[in-house]
């Protein structure tokens, strides 16, 4: 029995490490993938099904439901039920387990996936709550069906909680470790708070786009976006609230900026968008859409308060005929931001170019 318990815990811990390691090896960035974790936890669940824990040479304790708790917490109902269905089929038709237990596994998957994403507790507590829900379902099964004895559930309770705690701690710790490694390896390119390109990457990208625009005789535009009154958010609420605003702002910008253009956080409360081969009207319209979108949006703070914000946007623009000067387009955009601020904020300002 002891060997089987160690095996089950080892399979879970090794599987969790493998998930993080494979994902990091593939893209060098820690981006949570529902597909990755579903494939992994399905495989781990099958390994646990192949090696149940014997007790008194009479009972077998199955822990195949534990990996499904992670799917219920971190993915959604479709992924969790798909994994449960696959595991149930293999468990019944290959490992010879009862079809009633297979159905119970699917019921557990459905319930934990409906509850898991909405739990407000931290990850470890949330997984323990899902484990408790699963135990209650299995207890109900033991009372109604002769195929599962009450003594098996009593043995299952401490073992399942131990493996859930060990797996949850491993999952969270390894995630934090690889996230720190990812942050260290990408700090020259990415802003760790928002995930956008940082000011170094902005300079490199603007230089690259300027060269391409010059070579292909295309226009070049730059939007500098500054959050109005951001210092007041930090001072009145907290720096944690300011960080929350920056994260939400970066997501809002992603919703408005076309995929072919890159967004950067230049530092503090300033963001930028580099645009190539757009007319001045198109560039100004994009800036106005962003300004209007921010004005209509609500920003949620960690203390549950909701605030409204605005942005001032400066547009720098070089026509197809202009020499593509990285310094000039930045200066024009920066000057226009200051004009927008002086004109009362919450404005888009640009310097119209008229050639006679």
Swiss-Prot record:
GO terms for cellular component: plasma membrane. Keywords: Cell membrane, Membrane, Transmembrane, Transmembrane helix. One of its GO terms (molecular function) is diguanylate cyclase activity. It is a multi-pass membrane protein. The chain crosses the membrane at residues 2-22, 35-55, 76-96, 99-119, 124-144, 151-171. Gene3D superfamilies: 3.30.70.270. GO terms for biological process: cell adhesion involved in single-species biofilm formation; cell wall organization; negative regulation of bacterial-type flagellum-dependent cell motility. It comes from the Bacteria. This is Uncharacterized membrane protein SERP0413.
